[in-house]
A protein has these predicted regions:
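Minor-groove-contacting beta-hairpin "wing" of winged helix-turn-helix DNA-binding domains
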Residues: 94-100
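Short, conserved SAM-binding/catalytic segment
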Residues: 113-121, 382, 401-416
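Conserved SAM/SAH-binding loop
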Residues: 128-133, 416-422
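Short, amphipathic alpha-helical interaction segments positioned at domain boundaries
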Residues: 102-127
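Core catalytic lobe of class I
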Residues: 38, 48-77, 83-88, 95, ...
C-alpha cells in the first residue's frame, strides 16, 4: 500500500536494503523498539554482508568528512518510513525507532476528516473514513442503523478499540448525527458484547447499561434485547476454566431501539419461521381438544386453540446463528488471495439478513457505521435495500469489496484496486 520516493544516494550496498527490507526487520519484532546499532547488524545479516561493509567510511561532500554511505542510506529510509506512518522515534531516546501503532496492526487507518469512496453498487456505497466524520450532515434519512461497534476489549484486536471508559462516548459521537436524521419509523440494532470484564477481575463491565441510558437520553426507546446465541468457543478461559468463577459465555446481546415506538417499522411478519411438523399436525386436527388453566387462570387453553392456519411462527428473541457462513468464507478467501488481513470479528450474513428483514422494507436505507467485513451492506444489497457503510480501515474496505463484485453497478475505487491488486 505504502509508496516511497527514491532518494538519490551514492551507489553501494545500501541499495540492497530499501523500505520493504527495513520494514520487514521491524515487523519481525513488532512490539520491541530497535536501536540503530542492532538494526545495522540485522541489515548486514539479511543482505549477506560482513558488518565491516556497513562500518566502512568514505569522504563525503566538500568538507571531506567521512561517513558510512550504507548507514546513511538506512537512516534516510527510516525517515521515509516515518513520513509514511510506518516508523516513529521512541520519545526521549536517540537512535531508537519502533513501528507505529497502525503499522503494528498491519492496517491503513483513515486520518481524521478523511471521506473517500471505497466501492459502490447501484444500491449502496462503502466509504473509507471514520464514521464520526462520514455521517455528519447526512442529507438522506436512514430507516435502520444496523451495526456492531468495536468492543472495549482489554487487549484490542487488529482494528483497535476504545477503552471501557471511552466506549460510550465513542459510540454516541458516531450515532447521534444518524439518530437526528432518522425518521420516527426508524430503528437501531446494536450488537454488543457481555464478555467484557473489569481489569484484572471476574466482574463484568457495565458499559452496556451505561450505553443503554445514554441512548435513552438521546431520545430512543428500547424495544427488545435479542439474544444471539452462536457457536463461539468456550470462554472466558481465565474466569470460567481456570478460576472457575463464571459460566461460559454463549451469546451476545443485540439491542433493538426505536425513534418512536408507536411508529416503529419493525414487523415480525417479515421474519416468520416455518411451523414445526407437530404444530402443523395440531392445525390439521383443528387445534387443541383440551380445556386447561394455568397460573390462577392467567394462561388458558380451550378447545380449538391453535387450530387456525397461519403463514408461519413468530420468531422468539433468541437467534441461533453460527459464526461461519458461505459469504464469510468467500470474504476470507478473497482477503487471503489479496494478501490482506482478515477482519477478526466474524458476524455472519444471517444475523444482518434477519435484522434487515425485520426492521426494514425494500427500498429503505440501511446504515452501518462500522462495516468490518461489510456483511450488513451485503445483506441490504441482497434484500433490495439501499445502504451506506463506513469503515476506517482501507484493507477491510478492499476485502469487503470482493463480496459485491457481481452486483449491478459495482465500481471499486481504482486507486484502492491498484494499491492492493485484484483477485484473479
Amino acid at each position: 500500500m505504502k509508496s516511497f520516493r527514491s532518494r538519490s544516494t551514492a551507489p553501494g550496498q545500501g541499495e540492497l536494503f530499501g523500505a520493504a527490507e527495513i520494514t520487514a526487520i521491524y515487523e519481525s519484532r513488532p512490539d520491541a523498539p530497535l536501536d540503530n546499532a542492532t538494526l545495522y547488524k540485522l541489515v548486514a545479516k539479511r543482505a549477506g554482508l560482513d558488518e565491516s561493509a556497513l562500518n566502512s567510511r568514505v569522504p563525503v561532500g566538500k568538507s571531506g568528512q567521512r561517513h558510512s554511505l550504507e548507514r546513511r542510506a538506512i537512516r534516510w529510509t527510516q525517515q521515509d518510513l516515518r513520513r509514511a506512518g510506518v516508523l516513529e522515534r521512541v520519545p526521549g531516546a536517540r537512535g531508537i525507532w519502533r513501528l507505529t501503532e497502525e503499522a503494528r496492526r498491519g492496517l491503513s487507518m483513515a486520518k481524521p476528516g478523511v471521506k473517500v469512496l471505497g466501492f459502490r453498487t447501484d444500491l449502496g456505497v462503502a466509504i473509507f473514513g471514520g464514521s464520526e466524520h462520514i455521517f455528519r450532515n447526512l442529507d438522506v434519512q436512514p430507516i435502520s442503523i444496523i451495526c456492531s461497534p468495536p468492543y472495549p476489549l482489554a487487549k484490542p484486536r487488529a482494528y483497535g478499540n476504545p477503552s471501557q471508559n471511552e466506549i460510550v462516548k465513542f459510540i454516541m459521537d458516531t450515532l447521534e448525527p444518524l439518530i437526528e436524521r432518522m425518521p420516527d419509523s426508524g430503528s437501531l440494532a446494536l450488537n454488543l458484547s457481555q464478555d467484557i470484564f473489569l481489569p484484572g477481575s471476574a466482574a463484568r463491565s457495565t458499559y452496556i447499561e451505561r450505553l443503554t441510558i445514554a441512548l435513552e437520553d438521546a431520545g430512543l426507546a428500547l424495544m427488545d434485547r435479542i439474544v444471539w446465541k452462536s457457536n463461539k468457543p468456550p470462554g472466558p478461559i481465565r474466569y470460567a476454566s481456570i478460576t472457575r468463577q463464571t459460566l461460559n459465555v454463549a451469546y451476545e446481546p443485540i439491542l433493538i431501539w426505536a425513534k418512536c415506538p408507536a411508529r416503529f417499522k419493525g414487523d415480525n411478519r417479515r421474519v416468520l419461521e416455518p411451523h414445526t411438523d407437530r404444530h402443523l399436525a395440531l392445525i390439521a386436527a383443528g387445534g387443541e381438544t383440551r380445556t386447561v388453566s394455568y397460573g390462577d387462570g392467567a394462561y388458558q387453553l380451550r378447545p380449538g386453540a391453535y387450530g387456525t392456519p397461519t403463514e408461519g411462527r413468530i420468531p422468539k428473541n433468541v437467534l441461533e446463528r453460527g459464526l461461519r457462513c458461505a459469504y464469510g468464507n468467500q470474504y476470507r478467501a478473497a482477503a487471503e488471495r489479496l494478501g490482506l488481513p482478515v477482519h477478526g470479528a466474524a458476524q455472519p450474513y444471517s444475523v444482518a439478513e434477519f435484522l434487515i428483514r425485520y426492521l426494514t422494507e425494500e427500498g429503505d436505507l440501511v446504515v452501518d457505521p462500522w462495516a468490518g467485513r461489510s456483511m450488513t451492506g451485503l445483506a441490504a444489497e441482497m434484500l433490495n435495500r439501499t445502504w451506506i457503510c463506513g469503515e476506517r480501515s482501507l484493507e477491510y474496505i478492499r476485502g469487503g469489496a470482493e463480496l459485491f463484485r457481481d452486483q449491478p453497478g459495482f465500481y471499486l475505487n481504482p486507486q484502492i484496486e491498484r494499491a492492493f491488486g485484484r483477485v484473479g
